[in-house]
Amino acid sequence: MLPSSRARSLAALGMTLATAILLVSSLTLLAALPASAQSPPPAKLAQSLERVYGAGARVDTIHVDSATVYRVSRAGALLGFARVRNVKGKERPITYLVATDSADALRDIDILVYREPYGGEVAYDPWRKQFRGKTAAAPLQVGKDIRNISGATISSNAVTRAVRKTLAELTAWHAQGRLQ
């Protein structure tokens, strides 16, 4: 019996069918890692929180359900809350931070890890600054109160939707007294 063309191709690469299946399975599992396994480096998170809230701010970790929230204060006065999340870009996760002030308005957003080959403009300050001061009552929609980025439509839409959802969660948890 002659080997199939696929088996001959694998043999030419020095792979058996079992090796090829193992390789494909491993790559599939790697791509499906949960968002929690794709967190930013601690130094990057610390730099982002310092940039947003200033040096010397105290950061306490709070757990609400399965979510991690950072409560930020200085000299006992609440500065706001921050949360790190992942959202799917075109193909890969985008790790971002949403930071609020004590009145639940967006203080800033930060792109902590951008993994896509294109669309990285969502990390640039001119695009991020349009979120500042927005509340959960704002539409936060690309094309309305948030500008689109030519060539980064998927990323700008994904980040905008994710920021809107995260801001709504933080605002609700704060109103419910769950962020103490």
Language model regions located:
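Flexible, solvent-exposed loop/hinge segments and secondary-structure transition points
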Residues: L33-N157, R161-Q180
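A cross-taxon signal for low-complexity, glycine/charged-rich
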Residues: M1-V24, A31-P34, Q38
